[in-house]
UniProtKB/Swiss-Prot annotation:
<dbReference type="GO" id="GO:0045666">
    <property type="term" value="P:positive regulation of neuron differentiation"/>
</dbReference>
<keyword id="KW-0862">Zinc</keyword>
<feature type="compositionally biased region" description="Polar residues">
    <location>
        <begin position="852"/>
        <end position="868"/>
    </location>
</feature>
<keyword id="KW-0539">Nucleus</keyword>
<dbReference type="Pfam" id="PF05605">
    <property type="entry name" value="zf-Di19"/>
</dbReference>
<feature type="modified residue" description="Phosphoserine">
    <location>
        <position position="31"/>
    </location>
</feature>
<dbReference type="GO" id="GO:0007389">
    <property type="term" value="P:pattern specification process"/>
</dbReference>
<feature type="compositionally biased region" description="Low complexity">
    <location>
        <begin position="288"/>
        <end position="304"/>
    </location>
</feature>
<dbReference type="GO" id="GO:0017015">
    <property type="term" value="P:regulation of transforming growth factor beta receptor signaling pathway"/>
</dbReference>
<feature type="cross-link" description="Glycyl lysine isopeptide (Lys-Gly) (interchain with G-Cter in SUMO2)">
    <location>
        <position position="287"/>
    </location>
</feature>
<dbReference type="GO" id="GO:0030154">
    <property type="term" value="P:cell differentiation"/>
</dbReference>
<dbReference type="GO" id="GO:0043616">
    <property type="term" value="P:keratinocyte proliferation"/>
</dbReference>
<feature type="region of interest" description="Disordered">
    <location>
        <begin position="476"/>
        <end position="501"/>
    </location>
</feature>
<feature type="modified residue" description="Phosphoserine">
    <location>
        <position position="33"/>
    </location>
</feature>
<feature type="zinc finger region" description="C2H2-type 7; atypical">
    <location>
        <begin position="938"/>
        <end position="959"/>
    </location>
</feature>
<feature type="region of interest" description="Disordered">
    <location>
        <begin position="991"/>
        <end position="1117"/>
    </location>
</feature>
<dbReference type="GO" id="GO:0003682">
    <property type="term" value="F:chromatin binding"/>
</dbReference>
Length: 1117
């Protein structure tokens, strides 16, 4: 029996009985060893096994041209029809018919010899085209020309020899107690897993494509299409295909994606980067949403309860952002102007969630702008996040009596107008207290895991809003360009009844940067608010406004520049630099001094003190919570001059250094300024530290910090402000304070500060760092709040304040609860500062801030664990559910909420300890770790190849019909067994060579398989690229919903295993390396073998020559 070439079978569509008179004359195309019967391998994965098996049709209903074997009732439907018709309704015969025909047939076939009974066939050839014999295939999909000769009566599978048919019936159709039978057809299996895989053949082609060996483990099934997934988040992303939801939008080309993997790959490809306009991204043509929220309280006596999770119609879901996108995207979006429309209810139509008024900031028709809710732009991380500014207002009310935010968030227009009439109209600054949100930045994930957003707003006159330059791309504080030094004096101060009590009590505190600034203020029990009926002259400021004569513009000996950042930030930066390099060189010191805007000598002295251990990790002047102290940081030895209400001219000479006041009941600072200033303003954060003091309530007016001030003013508030703020508030301060000249954003950080060492506040007290509002961005940090605002969620740990990171003057932050988004803001041309390299957004630096002194938390410690988050980080709803602060999703478990947060932050918390790769989900890390351990739990039952990753295995199983082959050894063994004893001598003769060559042959087969996989991956990538290009040409929205669904499904299939493909690539590299080593070893072995053979041949030749010589000598003798 001669074997022809493999896979070269001759197609004989309709063999006749007279054509096959001699069975042995037929040229066999292949041996039956390819059938998996003897190896107990599932057949249905190569063909359908006639799974439809239209149960035991009566013989009279059989087609006339059917080939029938004894005792068998054949089926009418063929394998080809099974695939085309996707399982007909009358698939299987009844169990009774199976029982009638089953056992006797098995017995008969098993007892028969190799004599086949072949019945004549009808001559009609047309009717044979659909029969299973004519269309049956072997396991590789090749048509079997001889399948009609010996057909299984149960499954219509054809065989060339009767022994193969007997084996097939024995292993597939003989029932016993140990076997597992298919309920839809008569197949039996030795293992349950084989039966489960066989059941997939009864499914439609669409469903079968997604079912792999682990199909039994896919418990999350789609109710729409029947797809099943192993993990719930894969099902959630898949469901977006049916719902049409596309929460991920490319910020450049505005293409939207339903799957995060598709979005990430689109962003990383950067194909659409050239489509971005030069001066910002237009938002035209996109869907507009309506943003509305309840009106804010018009008086501090009725604060609105914060409701962070306010639902906004048509608000898309959140989206994660890739690390690269987080680093690069925000730069030019941050400067997009946003003008807030006015109105009591503020139902401002948004273009895709952005208050937009074109390239230039314009004043609205109303004299007072009102903001109730801000929807962050649909860029990258959020899409969009709704920030209810009333929540921020209520938080700030606790800290600063609500006056700062009321300037922007006051909703009662009538109340504003009446108060404006009461105010003195001599100052034109008071007339146009218009609030403009200049920019809302893109969220950014910081290196410690927190995410940060900036909301920039300014209080400007409508006339000034018109002169803002058009080029906002490089100027974040857009209104700052119009802020000149000719501002009229602020009429806003808060007078105290006991002014003298402040004047004599500044003697026991020192500056944090130097040791020359004494000062301590005794607390005042109550406040006297500014009377709006006062004349328009600069009123006498409160004693707390005393500042040293260290202004860089007025006093020549001032060491602090006008662009001096806040004191706390300076210390944080210096300590960060010190942590990086404790002994910097002179050049490095000069760079550090430039970055923090301090004199080189001062920085040098500070480093020397740190090296000498003179500067502890905490503030050098920790006053007790009940006592007040004033820290006036300055580099001069001059004593601050007390402010006199009758000497307004002294205000121009007052220093612009930080005034840090820590006292329980403390008066706000209010100082008047002469109208003409010789220099532009500089950042002057106002630091308010809330302290627990039963003595009374201290009100801090936003107007307290005036234009000439440069340094932070730290005031402390008592714990009882929530109750007392209703009684004691500065009613008209918000009108008079227009800080249009200041360069530093308002920094409001209300963080859970258990042992905050810099501010020296008692445990569990919220610390509020308030920088007076300016025309520049305002930074608000609200990670933790007091018990008065239970709905604001804490992000800080007990001993850390992540929002109080070291931020230079050009770093802007607003920390929304559980989110912290930071940006490097471009400073005004008047005050240019080099960017600080210590804190790079989402940077890869390994250094951390000094957590003991600066309260910087390592948020990874909290977020990286899969355990339940701390109670401070989560808040339960009334039903005991866990709600996300940034979107409307609610979760039953806190761990689910924690993992959901990764979608907002883009963080990958599960990191491999060997190669440092990070993954969002833990099971992805587990599969990745198998690469390092070498574990390969998944094995193909057809070719025997093993896989360490389920995605690689699934891909192999789904596409193996075209290339999956048994190993070379198995194939040779099966062919030798079929060939019989006549080829045994040849096998024995070539056994040694074959054993030596088989490893290389196996390696070549593996390389071929790997090459096929790589080719398929490259083809997939090319197809995906073609699809994306076609979609870009077709437009933003696909008009064909069906095509879009298919496209999204393909994208989902492609991206569902995005991280898995990374692991596959690593696995392929490992295999390639192993194969290379194996090939080298085989080659070396072959070379060594050839050398041995040559040596043996030479020895044999020498021996033969010696024998010949000996024989010749013998003959001669």
């Amino acid at each position: 029996m001669a074997d022809g070439p493999r896979c070269k079978r001759r197609k004989q569509a309709n063999p006749r009985r007279n054509n096959v008179t001699n069975y042995n004359t037929v040229v066999e195309a292949n041996s039956d060893s390819d059938d998996e019967d003897k190896l107990h391998i599932v057949e249905e994965e190569s063909i359908t096994d006639a799974a439809d098996c239209e149960g035991g049709m009566p013989d009279d209903e059989l087609p006339a041209d059917q080939t029938v074997l004894p005792g068998g009732s054949d089926r009418g439907g063929g394998a080809k029809n099974c695939w085309q018709d996707n399982v007909k309704d009358n698939e299987c015969d009844s169990d009774a018919e199976n029982e009638q025909n089953h056992d006797p047939n098995v017995e008969e076939f098993l007892q028969q010899q190799d004599t086949a009974v072949i019945y004549p066939e009808a001559p009609e050839e047309d009717q044979r085209q659909g029969t299973p014999e004519a269309s049956s295939h072997d396991e590789n999909g090749t048509p079997d020309a001889f399948s009609q000769l010996l057909t299984c009566p149960y499954c219509d599978r054809g065989y060339k020899r009767f022994t193969s048919l007997k084996e097939h019936i024995k292993y597939r159709h003989e029932k016993n107690e140990d076997n597992f039978s298919c309920s839809l057809c008569s197949y039996t299996f030795a293992y349950r897993t084989q039966l489960e895989r066989h059941m997939t053949s009864h499914k439609s082609g669409r469903e079968q494509r997604h079912v792999t060996q682990s199909g039994g483990n896919r418990k999350f099934k789609c109710t729409e299409c029947g797809k099943a997934f192993k993990y719930k988040h894969h099902l959630k992303e898949h469901l977006r295909i049916h719902s049409g939801e596309k929460p991920y939008e490319c910020p450049n080309c505005k293409k939207r994606f339903s799957h995060s993997g598709s979005y990430s790959s689109h962003i990383s490809s950067k194909k659409c980067i050239s489509l971005m306009p030069v001066n910002g991204r237009p938002r035209s043509g996109l869907k507009t949403s309506q943003c509305s929220s309840p009106s804010l309280s018009t008086s501090p006596g009725s604060p609105t309860r914060p409701q962070i999770r306010q639902k906004i119609e048509n608000k898309p879901l959140q989206e994660p952002l890739s690390v690269n996108q987080i680093k690069t995207e925000p730069v030019d979006y941050e400067f997009k102007p946003i003008v807030v429309a006015s109105g009591i209810n503020c139902s401002t139509p948004l273009q895709n969630g952005v208050f937009s008024s074109g390239g230039q900031l314009q004043a609205t028709s109303s004299p007072q702008g009102v903001v109730q809710a801000v929807v962050l732009p649909t860029v990258g991380l959020v899409s969009p996040i709704s920030i209810n500014l009333s929540d921020i207002q209520n938080v700030l009310k606790v800290a600063v009596d609500g006056n700062v935010i009321r300037q922007v968030l006051e909703t009662n227009q009538a109340s504003l107008a009446s108060k404006e009439q009461e105010a003195v109209s001599a100052s034109p600054i008071q007339q146009g207290g218009h609030s403009v949100i200049s920019a809302i930045s893109l969220p950014l994930v910081d290196q410690d895991g927190t995410t940060k957003i900036i909301i920039n707003y300014s209080l400007e006159q409508p006339s000034q809003l018109q002169v803002v330059p058009q080029n906002l791309k490089k100027e974040i504080p857009a209104p700052t360009n119009s802020c000149k030094s000719e501002k009229l004096p602020e009429d806003l101060t808060v007078k105290s009844e006991t002014d003298k009590s402040f004047e004599g009590a500044r003697d026991d505190s020192t500056c944090l940067l130097c040791e020359d600034c004494p000062g301590d203020l005794n607390a005042l029990p109550e406040l006297k608010h500014y009377d709006p009926e006062c004349p328009a002259q600069p009123p006498p400021p409160a004693p707390a406004t005393e500042k040293p004569e260290s202004s860089a513009s007025s006093a020549g000996n001032g060491d602090l520049s006008p662009s001096q950042p806040p004191l706390k930030n300076l210390l944080s930066l210096l300590k960060a630099y010190y942590a990086l390099n404790a002994q910097p060189s002179t050049e490095e010191l000069s760079k550090i001094a430039d970055s923090v805007n301090l004199p080189l000598d001062g920085v040098k002295k500070w480093f020397e003190k740190m090296q000498a251990g003179q500067i502890p990790g905490q503030s050098p002047d920790p006053p007790s919570p009940g006592t007040g102290s004033v820290n006036i940081p300055t580099k001069t030895d001059e004593q601050p001059q007390p402010a006199d209400g009758n000497e307004p001219q002294e205000d121009s000479t007052r220093g612009q250094s930080p005034v840090k006041i820590r006292s329980s009941p403390v008066l706000p600072v209010g100082s008047a300024m002469n109208g003409s200033r010789s220099c532009t303003s500089s950042p002057s954060p106002l630091n308010l530290c809330s302290a627990r003091n039963p003595q009374g309530y201290s009100c801090v007016a936003e107007g307290a910090q005036e234009e000439p001030q440069v340094e932070p003013l730290d005031l402390s508030l008592p714990k009882q402000q929530g109750e007392l703020l209703e009684r004691s508030t500065v009613s008209s301060v918000y009108q008079n304070s227009v800080y249009s000249v200041q360069e530093e954003p308002l920094n409001l950080s209300c963080a859970k500060k258990e042992p905050q060492k810099d501010s020296c506040v008692t445990d569990s007290e919220p610390v509020v760092n308030v920088v007076p509002p300016s025309a520049n961005p305002i930074n608000i940090a609200i990670p933790t709040v007091t018990a008065q605002l239970p709905t604001i969620v804490a992000i800080a740990d007990q001993n850390s304040v992540p929002c109080l990171r070291a931020l230079a003057a050009n770093k802007q932050t607003i920390l929304i609860p559980q989110v912290a988004y930071t940006y490097s803001a471009t400073v005004s041309p008047a005050v240019q500062e080099p960017p600080v390299k210590v804190i790079q957004p989402n940077g890869n630096q390994d250094e951390r801030q000094d957590t003991s002194s600066e309260g910087v938390s390592t948020v990874e410690d909290q977020n990286d664990s899969d355990s339940t988050p701390p109670k401070k980080k989560t808040r339960k709803t009334e039903n005991g559910m866990y709600a996300c602060d940034l979107c409307d999703k609610i979760f039953q478990k806190s761990s689910s909420l924690l993992r959901h947060k990764y979608e907002h932050t883009g963080k990958r918390p599960h990191e491999c300890g060997i190669c440092r790769k990070a993954f969002k989900h833990k099971h992805h890390l587990i599969e990745h770790m198998r690469l390092h351990s070498g574990e390969k739990p998944y094995q193909c039952d057809k070719c025997g190849k093993r896989f360490s990753h389920s995605g690689s295995y699934s891909q192999h199983m789904n596409h193996r019909y075209s290339y999956c082959k048994r190993g070379a050894e198995d194939r040779d063994a099966m062919e030798q067994e079929d060939a019989g004893p006549e080829v045994l001598p040849e096998v024995l003769a070539t056994e040694h060579v074959g054993a030596r060559a088989s490893p290389s042959q196996a390696d070549s087969d593996e390389r071929e398989s790997l090459t096929r996989e790589e080719d398929e991956d490259s083809e997939k990538e090319e197809e995906e690229e073609d699809k994306e290009m076609e979609e870009l040409q077709e437009g933003k929205e696909c008009e064909n919903p069906q095509g879009e669904e298919e496209e999204e499904e393909e994208e989902e299939e492609e991206e569902e295993e995005e991280e898995e493909e990374e692991v596959e690539a690593d696995e392929a590299e490992h295999e390639a390396a192993a194969k290379t080593d194996g090939t080298v070893e085989v080659g070396a072995a072959q070379q060594a073998g050839s050398l041995e053979q040559k040596a043996s041949e030479s020895e044999m030749e020498s021996e033969s020559e010696s024998e010949q010589l000996s024989e010749e000598k013998t003959n001669e003798a």
